[in-house]
């Protein structure tokens, strides 16, 4: 009996072990059932499109890696299915997602209305370029975490709901190219982080007063029905487009001396030198011609108007008559002066006339225009003329003056003038056409600088800019290396575009940055090549190296070396196991590497280069955890101002922006501030902005500054994953450097060379001194 039991135990043991191994794997892979139900309903509402992995019932979106799905453990946090020719509708299941943060169905053909209930956890909501109808739902007001929303290029109608009071974190809003009417709701004044607002091509009306207290940097209200004066604060917005509204006509008239106004507009006092103040002029100033206490009956006013019209008509007749008399007198005087000269020339022509010389004057003119092409001066003189700079706008260059001089006939002798005087008897020949502009000269081509305003001007043809070490890749080859930019190769995205992992046939890995069209659309091809050239000149051991580029079929891509350990942001905030590798000494070394990169950009490069987008997501880590800073030299794309729904991602983690950034000011001191924020992340292990924390701890800098010089509080701020393994003195020195970098006044922030020296001194002191504890 005992033998049988032992046999049963031996048989059951492998089965139990298999179950123990299998059950945890099932629990780890299984997607949240609520999310599964939500995505099944979404799939059915879309008409069951062909999307890899997606099914109408059940399934495991996270474990099976459905296309466009990003998960955090078992929760779906993002759905991105862009330009997939989707149809159908969104249905009523979106609100069932428990933790979703991003939804992007842009550039499809989805119709129906936007769901009346939306997931309250949404941060990014993109439905642009579809066929949605109906109005914007009032449930929008429940999205208190919303950062970016784009509903542009749809068929939406109705009025904007007055539900913006809770959307205090909204940074970008685009509802352009719809049929939305009504006025801007009063609750929009609560959008205190809104930097981009696009409402062009709608039927919106009313005034813009509700927007004047917002930190807008990009505002487009073109082709609406807005009226009234534009508030002064809006006129100072760096990118403000407002054509195609009734108040534009008022603005034009207000700066003109024309006596009448458009009948469809309320009369406004002409003020040629006075800008709009945002407040309408007082009633007694609106029509200076009116008498304030004059008769109010219609007869009195009509008689007054008729008198004014009669007097005005009489004045016009007198002016016209006077002008006619004056012109007649001038013509008579001119005829009297010219008659004697014509008579003398007629006598000369009758005495000596040589028919073969009639065209002498014309021939001399044609010498300067052979076959319609201007003849340039001799080579010796041409060199001097070509290098003559334009003195100021509107002034012709010296070469045009020389061409004009060549176009005129050369002086001729008295006898020659007698020979050709017969031409005066005939109508004067029409003047020769003005010479076309000189042919393009390589030395006159000016390519605008793109790294900073002081970069030396390239004097080469924009059609062919030589590249020394940067390889050109075709779009076809990059599609092959990235598997057609597959979702599984997406390793990051930002305001300038998305980054994909590319594997070459030899197995080597690269990172391909596919620039968003809205980030580079204002650059011509030759300007992009110039950008590539300038980035190629940035060479430093702590800066990601550019190895190639692509500019084909309206696509712009940059190919960089690949960093296997991802970004510092991911290492600190997304991977707890990886975070344990980041000892105190490693973090100090990372800060030093990033500081050296910025020191090189600010103080070694000539002219200096401002990064403008420094954050932990742009600090990459290689195999040895050495720091490589990315996106160096791309500031011209950031400042181009053509980034719409992606433009706010620079500020999505709002804590990186220096205080002066709200005023549109960005200098090297702003980079120093952002570097200080990254040092704070290294110190505390916290994100620069964390909405999930309590209100007083959401902004890292605001929370940390009061504690940096408090020894007791400083110890509590340190990242718990360090387990107390850090020298107390080193910690204090590290905090001092941070405090100087994040000063609110730019002039009090240190040079990056000073930061590098301070970090080196801190490391030397630690090596030669005795710390309170030893770092790993």
UniProtKB/Swiss-Prot annotation:
Keyword terms of this UniProt record: ATP-binding, Glycoprotein, Leucine-rich repeat, Membrane, Nucleotide-binding, Receptor, Repeat, Signal, Transmembrane, Transmembrane helix
InterPro entries reported in the protein's UniProt record: Kinase-like_dom_sf, Leu-rich_rpt, LRR_dom_sf, LRR_N_plant-typ, PRK1-6/SRF4-like, Prot_kinase_dom, Ser-Thr/Tyr_kinase_cat_dom
Cytoplasmic-facing ranges: 30-35, 338-776
Extent of Low complexity compositional bias: 254-268, 298-309
Domain remark text: The protein kinase domain is predicted to be catalytically inactive.
Homology family: Belongs to the protein kinase superfamily. Ser/Thr protein kinase family.
Name the record gives this protein: Protein STRUBBELIG-RECEPTOR FAMILY 3
Organism: Arabidopsis thaliana (Mouse-ear cress)
